[in-house]
Structure formats: structure tokens, C-alpha cells
């Protein structure tokens, strides 16, 4: 484990020096081929993901190489469970995709060094085996990329490989095709603040509902993520620093016939120990990124 973390850290440190070297070579040749490299990291008070709280304080480094809409990205989460450093839970995601004219499509391979802490034993080979790997397809449309004044986005994510299965009432296994759909809009505020609003749902039973029914009998709400994020960026040459705060409300499982009472329990739930499906979560963070094009 220590070797893995050390190699990852050294790799990121080594790559972070590359953009400036590449810029010098570019200046000498006078040519620009449109290749972009971005390297950086987020320091977060907790790992929040699509309505779930997946851990405590963490460092989340990333490296992205892009060229004419094609991109290859590596992202990692190096954190601690429940605000302690007794059990590290590293994750490494590799994404390859295409982004142009507001359209996005990519495939992500997610790997959990500590096993499969987020997907659990979901029935890989009828639960006789488990895997630390999952794969996810994503398609999205970001109108703000082509019409800056309308920063509306919609994204669809579906798990296509991994421990993503459930057992029905007849003890038969079925692939869940866990799906998360998110709609977002960004608001520019005074003082160069950016407020991002997101609403995410799961349309059927999935990892996001702990493989329980959603929208059943028109009672159970399948809204996984109502998210507000306030951010301020400071741009410098070849880099930017961002500071932000975020709150997230997970409405999954709320009985629509008793919404007032259920939402009234949100604060009480927030005071309890963190868990994956806690209703209300928050975090703060800082981002530092370097970028260069040559």
C-alpha cells in the first residue's frame, strides 16, 4: 500500500513539472499542435459522490491530457474513512473520452485498492467472486460550452461492468445497470463567485438506492442529490487556485406521503455518524491546478 501511494505521488510530482518544460520547447519551435496538459489536486474535508458520503478528509490528484476534443484523465482519491487515518481507502479512476461542441462521451475504469467499498458484493459471478474494478459509460450535453449565457448541463452515467447486481425475490441475480442522471445550472454572482446547482436522480434500483426499489407505488422519491456549490477561483499564469464550499441533500427513500415529517428529521440525521445514505452532507475544499498547451 505504501509503495502504491509513493509511486502515485512521485508520478504526479514528476508530471507537474512537464507543462513548463513543454512550454519552453514550444517557444523554440514556434509550433502549436493543440495538446493540453492539466495537473493538480483537490484537498477536501470529505469525499461526497452523487448523494453519498464515501469518506473523510482526502487528497484527490488528477492528470488530464487532451487534444482536439479527445482526452485521457487519471484521478485518484487518497483519503481516510470516518475522519481517521487508520484505514486508507485509495481509488484510481482512468477515463478516456471525447468532448466537443458541448457533447461529451467517455468510458471510466474505477479501481479500488482496498477492495470494492462502494459497490459491495453485488453479485459478480453469482457472488462467488468479487472485483475491485467497475466500468462506467457517460454521455452528456453542456449547453454552456457553446452558449456561454446558458450554462445548462445534463449528464447520464451507467455502470456497465463490475459488482453491480441485485437478487430478486426468487433469489435470481440481475445486472442493475446502475444509472445516475444529473441536471445542472451555473450562476455567476458578484465578487466573481460561481454558484453551481445540481439535481441528480436514479431511475431504477441501483447502487444509488442500495439496490432497493425507487419510485415504488409513487411514494419513494428517487432524487439522490440536490447539490449547491459556491466557488471562487483565482487565476494566475499556467495555474489557478479555487476555494469552495458544498452542501448535498439526498432525498432517496423519502415517502412522498409524509415529506414534511421526513425532511424534519434531516437535521437529526445530520448529527448522527456519517453513513453512505445520510440525508444531509457538506464539505469544504481547495483546488490547485497547473495547465499548459503546446
Predicted regions and their residues:
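Transmembrane beta-barrel strands of outer-membrane/channel proteins
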Residues: 39-45, 65, 74-78, 94, ...
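Surface-exposed loop and membrane-interface regions of Gram-negative outer-membrane beta-barrel proteins
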Residues: 72-99, 105-131
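Short glycine/proline- and aromatic-enriched beta-strand/turn motifs that initiate or cap beta-hairpins
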Residues: 23-82, 294
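Outer-membrane beta-barrel transmembrane domain signature
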Residues: 69, 145-151, 155-278, 285-294
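A short, structured loop/turn motif at beta-sheet edges
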Residues: 97-99, 140, 233-237
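Residues that define the transmembrane beta-barrel architecture of outer-membrane proteins
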Residues: 33-35, 55-59, 88-92, 99-101, ...
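Short, solvent-exposed loop/turn segments at secondary-structure boundaries
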Residues: 50-54, 83-87, 167-171
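Cleavable N-terminal export/targeting peptides
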Residues: 1-36, 266, 270-275, 292-294
Amino acid at each position: 500500500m505504501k509503495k502504491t501511494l509513493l509511486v502515485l505521488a512521485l508520478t504526479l510530482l514528476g508530471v507537474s513539472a512537464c507543462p513548463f518544460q513543454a512550454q519552453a520547447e514550444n517557444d523554440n519551435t514556434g509550433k502549436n499542435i493543440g495538446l493540453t496538459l492539466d495537473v493538480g489536486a483537490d484537498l477536501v474535508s470529505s469525499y461526497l459522490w452523487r448523494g453519498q458520503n464515501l469518506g473523510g478528509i482526502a487528497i484527490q490528484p488528477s492528470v488530464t491530457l487532451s487534444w482536439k476534443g479527445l482526452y485521457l484523465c487519471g484521478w485518484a482519491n487518497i483519503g481516510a474513512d470516518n475522519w481517521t487515518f487508520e484505514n486508507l481507502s485509495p481509488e484510481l479512476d482512468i477515463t478516456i473520452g471525447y468532448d466537443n461542441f458541448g457533447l461529451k462521451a467517455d468510458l471510466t475504469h474505477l479501481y479500488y485498492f482496498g477492495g470494492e467499498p462502494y459497490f459491495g458484493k453485488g453479485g459478480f459471478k453469482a457472488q462467488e467472486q468479487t472485483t475491485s474494478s467497475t466500468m462506467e459509460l457517460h454521455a452528456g450535453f453542456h449547453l454552456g460550452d457553446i452558449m456561454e449565457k446558458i450554462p445548462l448541463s445534463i449528464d447520464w452515467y451507467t455502470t456497465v461492468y463490475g459488482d453491480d447486481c441485485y437478487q430478486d425475490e426468487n433469489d435470481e441475480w440481475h445486472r442493475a445497470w446502475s444509472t445516475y442522471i444529473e441536471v445542472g445550472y451555473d450562476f455567476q454572482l458578484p465578487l466573481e463567485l460561481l454558484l453551481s446547482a445540481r439535481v441528480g436522480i436514479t431511475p431504477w434500483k441501483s447502487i444509488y438506492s442500495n439496490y432497493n426499489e425507487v419510485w415504488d407505488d409513487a411514494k419513494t422519491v428517487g432524487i439522490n442529490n440536490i447539490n449547491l456549490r459556491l466557488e471562487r477561483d483565482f487565476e494566475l499564469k499556467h495555474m489557478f487556485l479555487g476555494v469552495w464550499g458544498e452542501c448535498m441533500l439526498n432525498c432517496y427513500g423519502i415517502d412522498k406521503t409524509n415529506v414534511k415529517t421526513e425532511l424534519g428529521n434531516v437535521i437529526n440525521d445530520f448529527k448522527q455518524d456519517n453513513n453512505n445514505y445520510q440525508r444531509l452532507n457538506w464539505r469544504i475544499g481547495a483546488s490547485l491546478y497547473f495547465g499548459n498547451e503546446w
